Amino acid sequence: MGIKVCDLVMEYKKGVKVLNHVNLTIEHGIYGLLGENGAGKTTLMKILVTLLTPTSGTVEINGLTVKPENYEIIKKQIGYLPQEFGLYPNLTVREALEYVGIMSGMEKAEYQKQIDYYLEATGLSAHQKKKNRQLSGGMKRRVGLIQALLHNPSVLIVDEPTTG
């Protein structure tokens, strides 16, 4: 299980390949992708989380091929914290997290328990009634991380994990 990428190609403009026949196998564990700016790291991550469709090649997450008919199943297995993410500025921290729980199809008692756990674990319990616009960049990043973890994914993908 894990992630398997086979012969992945991604072209944004005709003839310009951002990913050129990438092959990669990632077993469960902690890994990092290193590369220069423009190397295609974010593009690869967006393909893994179903935000982009590659020009060619295949991707498997936990043995399931990433294709439109499997997107809903795959999205439940993946938590994603993008490089640039947005929080609704007028929602409180708790409201933003509850929204994710609802949209993930979780039972209310389950997402409330998870929210309480992660707010405590990240040191944000005292800030849960603050509007997102009142948070520092690092606090916003932690809220984004909680959103990515809330539904207990088996795979967590974090773009630019050391920022914020």
Model regions and ranges:
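Walker A (P-loop) phosphate-binding loop of ABC-type ATPase nucleotide-binding domains
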Residues: 36-40
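Catalytic Walker B motif of ABC-type/P-loop ATPase nucleotide-binding domains
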Residues: 156-159
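Conserved structural motif at the start of ABC-family nucleotide-binding domains
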Residues: 3, 18-19, 75
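Conserved ABC ATPase signature
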Residues: 131-135
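Conserved ABC ATPase "signature" region
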Residues: 98, 102, 109-127
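Helix-to-loop junction immediately C-terminal to a conserved catalytic motif
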Residues: 49
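Conserved ABC transporter NBD signature motif
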Residues: 57-67, 73-74
